[in-house]
A protein has these predicted regions:
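N-terminal, polar/charged subdomain of small-to-medium soluble alpha/beta proteins
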Residues: 1-111
């Protein structure tokens, strides 16, 4: 499912074992934009991928969230975080991506 937020596109993809309903998409957008909102003007697209790596078998930390950001004028950057549920996985990945983007933009500013 794809949404447009100002100039930044937001896309959500789920694996076959995760039901990607409107509620999950809204949660994902809120979590990711809360973490990255201060950088939204520098991003053209965000893609969130959720997958249940163990499927029906279950298990601890088996929900994997990968978030790919496409910064304007740069190569795409991606992070992955696994956790016990979708929200926790999205929060973890969003935090990792915020740290990575802040670092990359900081490097550009120092040049």
């Amino acid at each position: 499912m794809q949404k447009r937020r100002d100039d930044m596109q937001f896309q959500m993809n789920t694996g076959s074992d995760i039901h990607g309903d409107r509620h999950l998409v809204d949660d994902a957008e809120k979590i990711v934009t809360a973490a990255l909102g201060h950088l939204a003007h520098r991003l053209s697209r965000l893609e969130v991928h959720l997958a249940d790596v163990n499927g029906a078998k279950g298990g601890a930390d088996d929900i994997r969230c990968t978030i790919e950001a496409r910064p304007e004028g740069m190569k795409p950057l991606a992070v992955t975080h696994s956790d016990a549920n979708a929200k926790a996985a999205m929060h973890g990945a969003a935090k990792k991506l915020r740290t990575l983007l802040d670092s990359e933009f900081g490097k550009l500013a120092r040049r």
